[in-house]
């Protein structure tokens, strides 16, 4: 079978990190997962930035490109990486919640067939556009934190999506998985045990991997530091990945979405 026929038979997976609450790391995880899978693991990736009008990931790509253009070390890193990989940076497509799926479909129809498309959707799920886009996903991953208000909001979102979309056989959505984010090591005791019990009672799948509360998840490319963590042009640097549980999280995600 020739390669072009195989390309045509490949069905891209549509995946979103999504929850009702802002500030829980949806955009960060989208970028980290996309960059890790594309630059390190060799998967073909596209990102649809639906966070209208901010378009945070498109803004990050612009800042990353400017930083690389202005810094000799980053310029060398980029040249070496893209020469070795033999491909350009993954595309970041600007869209809106209403047009998210159409944007991805159009990109694919034009002959760009990635293995996986990540969608960065806004936190408000009270609009029809966001609900329709979530219904068009294959998998949703929801970061949760032990803050009571955030957790209650995230769980009510997850329960609603699970009931309305995952259990609805007419919808594309095959699964929604929760994972703990911003875990304070000192608190990973009775509080989390109690919350885990509640999540189990709600019959929501909880991932094994948890993400520790560490400042590195907030770091972008900066001129005076060559170690990279959150970037659309590079994967996270090995020294910064250590202890972040990022690799474990993405390995578990790959397992759940059955990425070949």
What name fits each language-model region?
Residues 182-231:
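Beta-strand-loop-alpha "switch" segments that mediate conformational coupling across diverse proteins
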Residues 47, 119, 142, 178-180:
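Structural beta-sheet core signal
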Residues 129-148:
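Inter-motif core of Ras-like GTPase G domains
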């Amino acid at each position: 079978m020739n390669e072009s026929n195989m390309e045509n038979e490949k069905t891209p997976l549509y995946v979103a990190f999504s929850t009702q609450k802002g500030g829980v790391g949806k955009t960060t995880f989208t970028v980290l997962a996309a960059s890790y899978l594309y630059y390190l693991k060799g998967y073909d990736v596209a990102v649809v930035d639906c966070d209208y009008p901010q378009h945070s990931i498109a803004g990050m790509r612009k800042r990353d490109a400017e930083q690389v253009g202005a810094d000799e070390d980053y310029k060398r890193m980029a040249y070496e990486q893209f020469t070795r990989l033999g491909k350009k940076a993954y595309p970041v497509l600007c869209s809106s919640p209403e047009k998210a799926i159409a944007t991805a479909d159009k990109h694919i129809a034009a002959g760009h067939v990635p293995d996986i498309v990540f969608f960065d959707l806004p936190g408000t799920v009270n609009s029809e556009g966001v609900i329709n886009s979530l219904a068009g996903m294959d998998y949703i991953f929801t970061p949760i934190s032990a803050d009571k208000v955030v957790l209650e909001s995230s769980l009510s979102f997850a329960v609603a999506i699970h009931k309305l979309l995952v259990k609805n056989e007419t919808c594309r959505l095959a699964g929604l998985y929760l994972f703990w984010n911003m875990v304070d090591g000192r608190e990973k005791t009775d509080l989390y045990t109690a919350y885990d019990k509640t999540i189990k009672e709600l019959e929501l799948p909880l991932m094994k991997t948890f993400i520790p509360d560490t400042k590195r998840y907030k770091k972008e490319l900066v001129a005076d530091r060559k170690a990279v963590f959150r970037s659309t042009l590079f994967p996270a640097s090995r020294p910064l990945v250590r202890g972040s549980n990022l690799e474990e999280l993405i390995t578990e995600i790959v397992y759940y979405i059955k990425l070949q």
